[in-house]
Amino acid sequence: MLKPEYLQRVPDGMIKLYAQAEMDILENMAVRIARYGYWIPAVEHQAKMLEEAGMVREEILARLKTLTGRTDRELRQLMQEAGGVALKSDDAVYRRQGLNPPPVSASEDLQKVLQAGYEKTAGTFRNLTLTTARTATHQFEQALDRAYMQITLGGMDYNTAIRSTIKQLSTEGVGAIRYPTGRTDTIEVAVRRAVVTGVNQTALRLQDARADEMGADLVEVSAHAGARPSHAQWQGGIYSRSGKSKKYPDFVKTTGYGTGAGLGGWNCSHSFRPWFEGMSRTYDKALLKEYQAKDYEYNGVKMTEYEALQEQRRIERGIRRWKREQNALQAAGLDSGEASARITEWNRRQRDFLEQTGLKADGTRVAVGKGSTPKEAERVALLKQKEIEKYSQYRYNKNGTIVVTDDWTKKEHPKVSAEYKPYAVVDVLSQKGKQTDRMYYDADGRQLRQVSTGAHGNPKRHPYGRNGEHAHDIIWKDGKIVDRPARELTEQERKENANIL
């Protein structure tokens, strides 16, 4: 069983990664808004705005794709650690009942659950990249159009309009998901929910699978102060997984296990452990009642822990909002004095709140990533633009050979990953430097094709060309490489790779 405190710490590393990405994206938007040429006809503005928005979208995709490898590694490690922690406590219960749970590594069912949980959450993050690019680009278009209208119609002077636009973007934060209702989640909110939900659901399914192996039906649900009211109704109880018990309520029907709003759903920190008749219960009625008591007081107002935590989150959002504004205005070369003063004010408000309630600060919830000076922001924006142009399409030399974006032939043991950058063309050496392998990546940054100048030391398996030169087509299915069939090079491939053949 995972404790709520464990789950609250789980997303810290991922949030730190994405907080910096969010700040980079917001600063880039602010710089573009500040440098835009507003004194142009409306028709020209529409075309130019779409061009700017397209570049913003590509920059967002490029920035978030740089996190893909680190995100995948972090998620896999989090899943394995959380699964180990959850099953360790459960297995101790089973052993006390005279049962003998096998190691996780020896259970094919548990390994499948672990892999499925990782793949589902990794897929959520891949989708997050696309939805963020779409949502944030829409934000940028609206902001730029609003500034244009304010300036050209005379509603505001140039500086006031730019400042107002950047302030509004900073208030909203970089949108990651936009719902049909109009509500938008920021990157920080989306990342936290994805990690907590993904890790907890995977751990719970591992516990479920283990309970099936052990033939266990009853579970005790965890309880904690600060639970949302709908979850407080069923936390701490004993339930029947099968729903067949006459003594204990149905686990799924009562807790909503398996649904977004139920146990193990969106941002839920509840868990469960196996329970057998004769075991003592962890939570009695008095303790559960105490969890719902109004034990906190702030400025004379009595609060439950849930209400106190909601107020703490509100204050943290205020700190993040002004930090974002300070960094964005500085990147755009505008005065950020008001934002700096507001940060001081909200930090003071947070200290007062924590002193009155006794709650602890959570640094990850007020972090927004490191800001840039105007010159640094301009330099970074220029570098990003060059990076985007470099990987915007395949490019060719005058003699018809393809342009190599990444020459890694001087690197020792370079790792050519399955996913890299869109339209990348990477050269590496193999066979002790005797063979060149050229990897092409597609528009989504996934391996597409490899051209090799030799037979990989195995001419029987690669009986192609004069010297074993050949191509491998990379076949993908369900997000994985499933095959790499070899074939002869086409005439066009020979032409564009003539510089290595």
Functional labels for PLM-detected ranges:
Residues G123-M214:
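Contiguous, non-catalytic segments that form substrate-binding/exosite surfaces or channel walls
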Residues M1-S164, L287-H413, L448:
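N-terminal leader/targeting and assembly helices and adjacent pre-domain segments
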